């Protein structure tokens, strides 16, 4: 059965900005090492890759969708140019207070991975927010937590926090090389 890496965008593939919106090219900076090490994961290891991101209020006057889409398309094309291809790109546009099932940590936009074609127990969510860890819990997976200590997303996980979610964290790192080495070490040790 296939395995998948469900990878957050902002703070994981690209650097997070102070206003948590990347709708302009000037704000776009790719995460250090992401092309080299995610590229090796894509070429050498047996994982499908999917991008999963919450984009609060996308499509509103404050966060125009056409500007976002131009940058988003550039991001996806840049990864593809490095032979890093995503089987899916999943973008939730809602605000946290809307509590929609499609918003991480909800699994509503990821049902295609939950229909028995993917081995979620041996798959990973990779992200920098507590919501990414809780998403892993909700999927029956583990999280590779790119923890920067800011506790981002903690207000969206109910009673769960970094301590209560610790059993769902496979490793904590801020380094794509460590992620590659961790996943490589699992080769042959997972059914």
Predicted regions and their residues:
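Substrate-recognition element of Asp-dependent hydrolases with the DxDx(T/V) motif
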Residues: 34, 38-71, 86-98, 136
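Active-site flanking residues adjacent to catalytic metal/cofactor-binding acidic residues
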Residues: 7-9, 53, 127-128
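Active-site neighborhood of HAD-like aspartate-dependent phosphohydrolases
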Residues: 1-49
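Alpha-helix N-cap and loop-to-helix initiation/capping positions
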Residues: 25-30, 63-70, 104-105
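Asp-based, Mg2+/Mn2+-dependent phosphohydrolase catalytic module
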Residues: 66, 73-85, 98-125, 129-191
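Surface-exposed cleft-lining segments at the edges of enzyme active sites
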Residues: 19-27, 59-60, 96-99
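Residue-level signal for short segments within beta-strands and strand-turn junctions
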Residues: 15-17, 93, 147
């Amino acid at each position: 059965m296939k395995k998948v890496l469900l990878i957050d965008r902002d703070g994981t593939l690209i650097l997070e900005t102070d206003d948590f919106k990347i709708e302009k090219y000037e704000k776009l900076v790719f995460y250090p090492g992401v092309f080299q090490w995610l590229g090796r994961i894509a070429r050498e290891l047996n994982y499908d890759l999917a991008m999963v991101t919450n984009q609060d209020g996308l499509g509103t006057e404050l966060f125009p969708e056409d500007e976002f889409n131009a940058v988003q398309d550039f991001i996806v094309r840049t990864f593809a140019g490095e032979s890093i291809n995503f089987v899916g790109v999943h973008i939730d546009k809602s605000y946290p207070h809307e509590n929609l099932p499609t918003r991480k940590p909800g699994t509503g936009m990821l049902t295609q991975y939950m229909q028995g074609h993917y081995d979620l127990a041996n798959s990973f969510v990779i992200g920098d927010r507590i919501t990414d860890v809780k998403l892993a819990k909700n999927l029956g997976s583990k999280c590779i937590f790119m923890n920067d200590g800011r506790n981002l997303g903690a207000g969206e996980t109910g009673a769960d926090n970094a301590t209560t979610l610790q059993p769902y964290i496979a490793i904590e790192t801020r380094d794509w090389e460590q992620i590659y080495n961790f996943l490589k070490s699992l080769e042959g040790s997972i059914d």
